[in-house]
Each structure stands twice: as structure tokens, then as C-alpha cells.
A protein has these predicted regions:
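Ligand-binding "clamshell"
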Residues: 2, 66-78, 134, 182-196
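An extracytoplasmic/periplasmic, membrane-proximal ligand-sensing/linker region
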Residues: 2-5, 13-18, 202, 208-209, ...
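Bilobed "Venus flytrap"/periplasmic-binding protein-like clamshell domains
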Residues: 3-29, 38, 61, 85-160, ...
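N-terminal low-complexity or amphipathic/hydrophobic leaders
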Residues: 42-66
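Hydrophobic residues within well-ordered alpha-helices
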Residues: 48-49, 104, 164-165
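A ligand-binding cleft/hinge motif common to bilobed small-molecule-binding domains
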Residues: 57-70, 123, 128-129, 158-190
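Short Pro/Gly-enriched coil loops immediately N-terminal to beta-strands
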Residues: 77-87, 196-203
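Active-site/pore-lining binding-face segments in mid-to-C-terminal subdomains
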Residues: 176-214
């Protein structure tokens, strides 16, 4: 049987190390896979639909792109334990006199890259639901680092956080995990910033399978993947790099806010020219 081809986007050099370890594990489990690398998520989704690969390790936005372009027929696979129930935080300075969303009317708000679900798309939809309309009620200051990587490159999010510290923006958006990390490492001082608003929970990355991929083969891939054990030192290294302790069953209910954001902004039409 030919190797199952699995796509991954190189948002960081460590990605090839991660997938080298995963491929070795699958080889040892007598279910060989071949990692195929892409420079951005659009290329990966294009590759999946063109059958260059059988499975894609997708960002939430790449999942939505795949879902829409296959009219909902793509297969949905596993997630990391850390992909579920994420939230984005709207952060302001404690001395800013900004105490409500409405206080941001006509102010400048910092966002991550144009295609970041957590630092731009879901936040814009959140503001919309709370009465602040994009392009009208506030000024967007965007930090386009790693466009095409769907916010996996944290640079834009970090630059926006630094802009808040430097009073270049009145507020900034960041993923909950990044907020916690930046408070812990001193990038942000918890005495100088506060969380003004939090989005509802959403989910992050997920495996997508080509609609015509044999379902039993896809399920076997998932079964083997779930055998990875954080207590096994040879697995732990990879799992730490990939930010998980356990592979879990995927779900798509956590992509509702991102789906709404795409509809509100007509994002794919603008971004891909479709």
C-alpha cells in the first residue's frame, strides 16, 4: 500500500522536526505516512483538493476553506487537546479609562495578521456582535506578519501587543494562551493591562481528509495517531513542540464564530479573490 500523504504548513522550522518524529512513530506502527510540506495554508488546501495529499493538518481557517470548497464533504479528523475551547482576549491598559466595548468607538484597535482567526477574524465578528462595525466604528491597525500562515506565526499578535505597550493602539487582541504566556514571561505586566472582553470559546487546528479518501484508512490514521503517549519520552519531545499532551477526537462545532466572521467580512472572496 502506498504511504498516506499528510500535509503540514511550515510556519516554523520545527515543523519538519515534529513531522519527522510523527512519521517515525507511524513507521514503527506499520502504518507508514509521508509528510508533505507547504509554505502556506492556501497551497495546502489546494494540494488536498488536487489529491497531492490525502490528509491535511489544517488551521481553523484552512478547515473552513476546505469545508466550503468541498461543500462539506471533506473528512474531519483529530485535534490536539489544546485546540478545544480557546478564547481571544481584548486587552487594554489599566490606566486607559477604557472600561467597556463602547469606549473603543472611534479608537484604534490592534489586530494580528489579516488571516489570523484568533487575532483578527473572530475578534472582528465579536466586536460586530457587540455593536462595533468593522470599517466604521473603529480604526483597524493590523500587523501582517506571516500572511498565509493563518496566525500560526505569532509575530503579528506580538507586535500588536507591543504597540499597546507603546500607546500606538487603544486595545489589542490575542489568543488566551498567548496572553497567559506573555504575562508569565514578562512581555506584558499584569498590573499594567487588563482584559476588557473575551470571545466565546472556539476551536483551533484539525485534520482534514480528502472527500474520496477511504474512510477506513482515515480512521486507521486517527487510531494510530491517538496511540502517541505523552508519558513516552520519545513522544513527549514532539508533543511539547506541537503544544499538546493528547490527541483527541475532532469536532466542528467550534468553528461557528469563524464561519460567521467569513460571512460578515466576505473574507475568502477578498483574500483569495474568489
Amino acid at each position: 500500500m502506498t504511504k498516506l500523504k499528510v500535509g503540514a504548513v511550515i510556519y516554523d522550522p520545527k515543523v519538519t522536526v515534529i513531522w519527522g518524529i510523527i512519521a517515525k512513530f507511524f513507521e514503527d506502527e506499520n502504518f507508514p505516512i509521508e509528510p508533505v510540506y507547504y509554505k502556506d495554508y492556501k497551497g495546502q488546501v489546494d494540494g488536498l483538493l488536487a489529491k497531492e495529499i490525502d490528509v491535511a493538518w489544517n488551521s481553523p481557517l484552512a478547515w473552513l476553506d476546505t469545508h466550503l470548497r468541498t461543500k462539506g464533504t471533506a473528512l474531519n479528523g483529530s485535534m490536539r487537546d489544546t485546540d478545544r475551547d480557546r478564547s481571544s482576549y481584548l486587552v487594554v491598559k489599566t490606566n486607559s479609562n477604557i472600561n467597556s466595548i463602547q469606549d473603543l468607538r472611534n479608537k484604534t484597535i490592534g489586530f494580528g495578521a489579516i488571516d489570523s482567526p484568533q487575532a483578527r477574524l473572530i475578534p472582528i465578528n465579536h466586536l460586530h456582535k457587540l455593536g462595533l462595525e468593522f470599517g466604521k466604528d473603529y480604526t483597524e491597525k493590523r500587523f501582517d506578519i506571516g500572511v498565509g500562515l493563518h496566525g500560526d506565526h505569532v509575530g503579528g499578535e506580538l507586535d500588536s501587543a507591543i504597540a499597546l505597550k507603546n500607546d500606538e493602539v487603544a486595545a489589542t487582541w490575542m489568543l488566551d494562551l498567548n496572553y497567559n504566556a506573555w504575562i508569565a514571561d514578562g512581555t506584558l505586566d499584569e498590573n499594567q493591562v487588563k482584559i476588557l472582553s473575551k470571545t466565546d470559546f472556539f476551536d483551533h487546528c484539525i485534520f482534514s481528509g480528502h472527500p474520496e479518501l477511504d474512510v477506513a484508512r482515515f480512521e486507521k490514521f486517527i487510531e494510530v495517531l491517538h496511540k502517541m503517549d505523552y508519558n513516552n519520552p520519545s513522544h513527549k519531545e514532539m508533543m511539547d513542540m506541537e503544544g499538546l499532551k493528547e490527541w483527541i477526537s475532532g469536532r466542528t462545532s467550534g468553528f461557528k464564530q469563524l464561519t460567521e466572521a467569513n460571512e460578515y467580512l466576505d473574507f475568502f472572496k477578498e483574500f483569495h479573490g474568489e
